[in-house]
């Protein structure tokens, strides 16, 4: 709403048909949706605004963690670090492949020169409200903003 649209919640499986029939005019997703979800058959412009990143995390209950030996904790931490690095490599390759396929076989144009500051300004009120509603979010957002 803050960006001038009318958000519509729907299952991912309904997005293609909704785009096809004009129920929705666009979708928010990563580049792979253009190819795996076939959205590039309908959506011919993709704006790369980097408003979201894939923050995959590994979680474990504190109760379980405390019952694991320090040696095994280190093994788990190292495996998590290694899998994170491998995931980054695989994800980057998947994105590159999706972009190439979307451009060459679907005719999708990629717009990379996006006015990100305009998006930040338009959503600043929403972000402020969210920070008030959920204590601690401001600190997390500051950490996210500090990452380049």
Predicted regions, residues:
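N-terminal secretory/targeting leader peptides
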Residues: 1-148
